[in-house]
A protein has these predicted regions:
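N-terminal beta1-alpha1-beta2 module of alpha/beta enzyme domains
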Residues: 1-87
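Internal, glycine-rich beta/alpha segment that forms the wall or movable "lid"
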Residues: 4-7, 102-196
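Hydrophobic faces of well-ordered beta-strands that scaffold small-molecule active sites
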Residues: 8-12, 54-56, 90-96, 119-125
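Active-site beta-loop-alpha junctions enriched in small/polar residues
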Residues: 15-17, 59, 97-99, 126-128
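Generic structural signal for helix capping and beta-alpha/helix-loop junctions
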Residues: 20, 63, 100-102, 131
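Active-site mouth loops of central-metabolism enzymes
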Residues: 22-37, 94-104, 140, 145
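A generic short-segment signal for beta-strand/edge and adjacent turn/coil regions
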Residues: 22-25, 51, 63, 91-94, ...
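Low-complexity, flexible helical/coil segments
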Residues: 44-51, 88-95, 127-133, 157-163
Length: 196
């Protein structure tokens, strides 16, 4: 019997002010989730260190008593797009909520990151458990079971949107004057509770 070679996967969870609530206060600490140059150095170091993925969490609310990393953070997909330019191999994953997002926007944003990074995008699907997030969207916060039902359909719609363009749809045929092969584009005809 041949045993397969098992390898550990390493992911770096990046927090704006560090993981310890007071870590950013150490004399040599270089905290700053809004400092792109610092984050690019961290990403490049993680890639050289053979990490498989960088992960950016996100939340849609904050509070005065929140951990500093929950307050001072940039929008993760935009930040990961910038980090894609200073890395070439490491995966780029972010949290995006299904409760307070729209499937089309999420599908488009992750597809864009995936193209920019040459296939390195990853999505941490969450339903947003913090009820105080709802006020930022002018909504009532749904109960647990409803959030998870929405999440299941949301992911189904996003995956369907990703699959609506076949591989090789972009042909850039100058002679024929065709940028896209429209036979390889498909309309997602989803009818459900969250999307029509």
């Amino acid at each position: 019997m041949v045993r397969s070679k098992r390898q550990m996967r390493l992911g770096l969870f990046v927090q704006a002010a560090g993981h310890h609530v007071a870590g950013w206060r150490l004399p040599k600490a270089e905290a700053g989730g809004e400092n792109l140059a610092l984050l690019q150095r961290i990403a490049a170091t993680a890639e050289r260190g053979k990490f498989d993925m960088i992960f950016l969490a996100d939340g849609l609310t904050t509070a005065k008593d929140a951990h500093p990393s929950m307050v001072a953070r940039l929008e993760p997909l935009l930040l990961l797009s910038a980090l894609a330019m200073s890395t070439s191999r490491i995966g780029l994953a972010a949290t995006v909520s299904t409760t307070y997002g729209e499937p089309f926007h999420v599908a488009r944003a992750f597809a864009s990151l995936d193209h920019i990074s040459n296939g390195r995008a990853g999505w941490n699907v969450v339903t947003t458990s913090y009820a105080r997030s709802a006020v930022n969207f002018g909504r009532q916060h749904p109960e647990h079971d409803e959030r998870y039902a929405v999440a299941a359909e949301f992911v189904e719609v996003v995956r369907g949107l990703w699959d609506s363009w076949e591989d090789g749809a972009v042909i850039k045929d100058k002679a024929a004057g065709r940028y896209v092969d429209t036979d390889k584009l498909h309309v997602l005809d989803h009818v459900g509770n969250i999307s029509r």
